[in-house]
Structure formats: structure tokens, C-alpha cells
């Protein structure tokens, strides 16, 4: 089952991406390096719940 998640920037800008992930294949928290346009750099994004 694919669940919708939010990827929040670790730079503290409040910028986020939304995506989905397969919980069966990836049971832990997702961490991925992506581009944050607020700081204009690639930073780590960490998984958070969509409220």
C-alpha cells in the first residue's frame, strides 16, 4: 500500500515536497537529498506526516 508523505527540508525553511512511498518495501523513515529553492542548495529532506 502506498501512503502519501511530506518531505520537509532540514534547512529549517519550511519548504516541503509531497510524495508517496511503499511501506512494505521501506518501513523506516525516508531521508533523501533534494533541492531547496529557498536556500538554493541541495539539502536533506526528512519524512513527515501530511496533516
From Swiss-Prot:
InterPro entries: Ribosomal_bL33, Ribosomal_bL33_CS, Ribosomal_bL33_sf, Ribosomal_zn-bd. GO terms for molecular function: structural constituent of ribosome. The keyword Ribonucleoprotein applies. Keywords: Ribonucleoprotein, Ribosomal protein. GO terms for cellular component: cytosolic large ribosomal subunit. GO terms for biological process: translation. Pfam families: Ribosomal_L33. SUPFAM superfamilies: Zn-binding ribosomal proteins (SSF57829). HAMAP family: Ribosomal_bL33 (MF_00294). Belongs to the bacterial ribosomal protein bL33 family. This is Large ribosomal subunit protein bL33. The gene is rpmG.
Amino acid at each position: 500500500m502506498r501512503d502519501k508523505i511530506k518531505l520537509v527540508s532540514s534547512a529549517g525553511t519550511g519548504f516541503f515536497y509531497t510524495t508517496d512511498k511503499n511501506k512494505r518495501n521501506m518501513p523506516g523513515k525516508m531521508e533523501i537529498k533534494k533541492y531547496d529553492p529557498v536556500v538554493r542548495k541541495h539539502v536533506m529532506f526528512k519524512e513527515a506526516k501530511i496533516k
